[in-house]
Amino acid sequence: MQTDLSDSSFFNHKSVMTDEILASLEHYPLIHNNQLKGIDATLGGGGHSYHLLRKYSDLHIIGLDQDPFARKSASKKLDEFKNRIDIRAANFADFEPKEKVSFVIADLGVNSNQIDDPKRGFSFQKDGPLDMRMNPFLEVDAEKLIETLQEKDLANLIYKYGDERLSRKIARKIKMDLKVNGKYSGTKELAYSIAGCFPPKQRYKKIHPATRTFQALRIAVNKEIEVLEKFLQIVPDWLLPGGIISIISFHSLEDRLVKSSFKNDQRLKNLTKKPITPSEQEVEINKRARSGKLRVAQLN
């Protein structure tokens, strides 16, 4: 079952590290000039773009998002800037701007509203279908993924993308459940089955034992690593000389890719040898910000 596109009221995502994103763009030498253009490669609910459009009165932004629910919500949030925001249905790895821009920002985190909406299937806090697609038109969802992968491949995926040491045991349990009982009823049943692979003392810790496996499945369903690798290769070509790339990541796989790209791409000057992290005040207000890491680079 899909969420009704007519109801975007649930999409109330709180953008992460907004002040730090704004500060990172001050490295661009012409940031205060007229006719400034930028790309928000992960528009989401429009939070980062909202603050940018408020700060820079002559700024025009192209906002990209593959999630139709996010685009509808962002359109409402940014209505007062409708003459300066161009919202596109696109995955950032497949986009090609017609002209170069002054900056590109990207927040690689899963939108909190995607997590909180049980119909999207990202979370086990509330039961929902095993979906996990950021773009609801993708062919393979989480249910189809676990059904079609061989046990060994599923274990490797859970280990690689979730850093889960019990990946083999979990994959074996998932494939056995599917063989004996058929499809899982939803996210909660899968999470319960995964938790059963852990010793009793580890089942009731602060972080749910299924968290890493769910992360791995989400990354695989949306091909997040492959998409990010492609994006990092093409994004310098989007920029004007001196242009800025600011990327927020939330797990080590993504951060390593961004760090390596900014360090080794000869087209770029790395402006953050160490990542910028959220302030204590922000983490206190928004717990989901705590693992955010911002890295910034400038086109030579």
Swiss-Prot record:
InterPro entries documented for this protein: RsmH (IPR002903), SAM-dep_MeTrfase_MraW_recog (IPR023397), SAM-dependent_MTases_sf (IPR029063)
Subcellular location, principal: cytoplasm
Family named by the database record: Belongs to the methyltransferase superfamily. RsmH family.
Protein name in the entry: Ribosomal RNA small subunit methyltransferase H
Gene3D superfamilies, per the entry: Putative methyltransferase TM0872, insert domain, Vaccinia Virus protein VP39
GO molecular function: rRNA (cytosine-N4-)-methyltransferase activity
Role according to the record: Specifically methylates the N4 position of cytidine in position 1402 (C1402) of 16S rRNA.
Keyword Cell cycle annotated: no
Subcellular location per the Swiss-Prot or TrEMBL entry: Cytoplasm
Biological source species: Prochlorococcus marinus (strain MIT 9312)
Transmembrane segments: none
Primary enzyme class: transferase
Catalytic function, reaction form: cytidine(1402) in 16S rRNA + S-adenosyl-L-methionine = N(4)-methylcytidine(1402) in 16S rRNA + S-adenosyl-L-homocysteine + H(+)
HAMAP family membership: 16SrRNA_methyltr_H
A Gene Ontology biological process term: rRNA base methylation
Residues binding S-adenosyl-L-methionine: G46, G47, H48, D65, F92, D107, Q114
Gene Ontology, cellular component aspect: cytoplasm
